[in-house]
């Protein structure tokens, strides 16, 4: 990828060749991964790690780049004014955003050898307070978006991601604020278990409207695993002319449970979570394996989707699987599995025969 001049939109006009030449891979798994590593409070889900342990955040960006993510998304998800108010830390709003943006910019400007140029994305997301027919609340949300977009532009973001919207009108409002900045936009929606937006729009209607309003990339992210996201990506890709994004969660969602919020654990669990549901801290046995994620990436890539990633639950191994499934060799490919050398299951002639024979009963 060759970064275009800052005055040139990334996904349109003269810079369209950038997008055509190489797929864009976006790791969006920061929230769950930071919680797993002990640097983020589950339930609150606020990216305080940017201020408290910036070196940890920088390292995770680097790990995702090593695995193939050529987009470095600033970890400002849930770092908006409303969420900071809920945890009584609204005074840290701007410092958190600016530090997260600067860390992402630093990593994008210093990609690992073998990755190529990385792009840095600012981020705005679901406010969790949007209400239909409530102009006062809607104005408040737009103001929240506006300040975060402003900071992202000032910290030299290449484009802005607006993500995880389950109200169509909120997604439209996010796009409106991004467009005011002059930066390219990626807008991804996250319909919940009713398989429609909470304000009544269908998934396809919402995506078509986003394209009409000028979004550069439109698609789905979060909540849905590969099985329940793929059918909608197929529909969207057929209808939309703009670029399409697909970023599932790595969990085995089903037709009965299309999102990860109410997934049951039928795997013999004898110690359920204290809050009574698998989401968000007891979903470990419900994860997709890496090959399922790779298969999803290959399927959507073959449909013509070139903006691909993995959302909550992603780890670097998932991102590498995405990259390799669509034909890329990335720095982490150096450590791709090599079962031929395994002490029981390897095919190498140097592996003792008696150990190979023992493999099926080990």
Predicted regions, residues:
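Single conserved hydrophobic/aromatic residue that forms the stacking wall/gate
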Residues: 1-15, 19
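Domain-level signal for soluble alpha/beta catalytic cores
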Residues: 13-362
